């Protein structure tokens, strides 16, 4: 017997990331090949025509798992009974815009969306914030939804995680799928810290295989941190397909489990690893039965502490910049 359809809300539905994301969700890549979905698409009033065009294309794919589509500019319609909410839409930084202005503009969007989720979404809704600054936007949404469990709110660090995996595979000559126990700590920004001190490839210790501290500090970490900028430089557009792919990975693993493998998610801190409570911070997790669990008890050396504190300080500054908007 067919499963009842799950409702997946996607914001910024007319945008580039959503265009790479929606067809994969409708194809079963997000929640499984036996799980029907209803897409609930949110975008601004002026983008409704473009969303309709995307929905025409979705119709033309005749996806067996796509049970229905809702198009709206009202967050309360988009998030009604949502099982998963992918918050992709955010205010991009325009020329001459200060970072604090960007934070304020996004605080407004994510306060409204957090309140709407609080009011109408499923109490078990899994929220992934993709729109930047993702960690702080997730924090704002979480703080605006006091009736939902904090653990329901996450930010996307999976793109950084996947970027790091690919660099490590290239450097070590090992298949990307063989690399395990990679962690990415902190903010989804150039300050985040990809950490392969615990990683293995085909069961071998990756730090011994690579054995190049200079490469780690001066090539690997900056390459992962600045990859988004490098793609804009090369392509003239920001990374959309790889971001959509990371969003699929993040939610699929959260829902269907990681079989004991580590992945990175931005989650509300419980105070461990010296990260103040409630800060949305990238940490290694495993997922099972629809829940994530942080990997506990990892040793933090002096270099790692410095890196982890650097990215934390950026998050604390961002939080400071939006605190007055949260009431």
From Swiss-Prot:
Annotated catalysed reactions: (S)-malate + NAD(+) = oxaloacetate + NADH + H(+)
Biological-process GO terms, alphabetical: malate metabolic process; tricarboxylic acid cycle
InterPro entries hit by this protein: L-lactate/malate_DH, Lactate/malate_DH_C, Lactate/malate_DH_N, Lactate_DH/Glyco_Ohase_4_C, Malate_DH_type2, NAD(P)-bd_dom_sf
Keywords: NAD, Oxidoreductase, Tricarboxylic acid cycle
Enzyme class: oxidoreductase
Entry's transmembrane regions: none
Active site per UniProt: 188
Binding site for substrate: 93, 99, 132, 163
EC code(s) of this entry: 1.1.1.37
Residues reported in the UniProt entry to bind NAD(+): 12-18, 106, 113, 130-132
HAMAP family cross-referenced by the UniProt entry: Malate_dehydrog_2
Function noted in UniProt: Catalyzes the reversible oxidation of malate to oxaloacetate.
Protein name (record): Malate dehydrogenase
Lineage: Bacteria, Pseudomonadati, Pseudomonadota, Betaproteobacteria, Burkholderiales
């Amino acid at each position: 017997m067919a499963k009842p359809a799950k409702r997946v809300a996607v914001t910024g539905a007319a945008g580039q990331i959503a265009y790479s994301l929606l067809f994969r969700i409708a194809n079963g890549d997000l929640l499984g090949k036996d799980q029907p979905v209803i897409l609930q698409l949110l975008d601004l009033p002026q983008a409704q025509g473009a969303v309709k065009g995307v929905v025409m294309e979705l119709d033309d794919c005749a996806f067996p798992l796509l049970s229905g589509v809702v198009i709206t500019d009202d967050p309360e319609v988009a998030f009604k009974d949502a099982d998963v909410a992918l918050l992709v839409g955010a205010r991009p930084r325009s020329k001459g815009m200060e970072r604090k202005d960007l934070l304020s503009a996004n605080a407004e969007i994510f306060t409204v969306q957090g309140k709407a989720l609080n009011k109408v979404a499923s109490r078990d809704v899994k929220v992934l914030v993709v729109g930047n600054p993702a960690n702080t936007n997730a924090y704002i949404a979480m703080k605006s939804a006091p009736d939902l469990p904090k653990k329901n709110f996450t930010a996307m660090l999976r793109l950084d995680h996947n970027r790091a995996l690919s660099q490590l595979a290239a450097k070590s000559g090992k298949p990307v799928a063989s690399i395990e126990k990679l962690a990415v700590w902190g903010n989804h920004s150039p300050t985040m810290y990809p950490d392969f001190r615990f990683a293995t490839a085909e069961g071998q210790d990756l730090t011994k295989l690579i054995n190049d501290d200079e490469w780690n500090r001066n090539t690997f970490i900056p390459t992962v941190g600045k990859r988004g900028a490098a793609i804009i430089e090369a392509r003239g557009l920001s990374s959309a397909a790889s971001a959509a792919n990371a969003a699929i990975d993040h939610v699929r693993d959260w829902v269907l489990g990681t079989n004991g493998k580590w992945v990175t998610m931005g989650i509300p801190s419980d105070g461990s690893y010296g990260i103040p409570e409630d800060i949305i911070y990238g940490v290694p997790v495993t997922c099972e039965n629809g829940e994530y669990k942080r990997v506990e008890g990892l040793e933090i050396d002096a270099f790692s502490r410095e890196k982890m504190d650097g990215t934390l300080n950026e998050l604390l500054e961002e939080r400071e910049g939006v605190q007055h908007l949260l009431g």
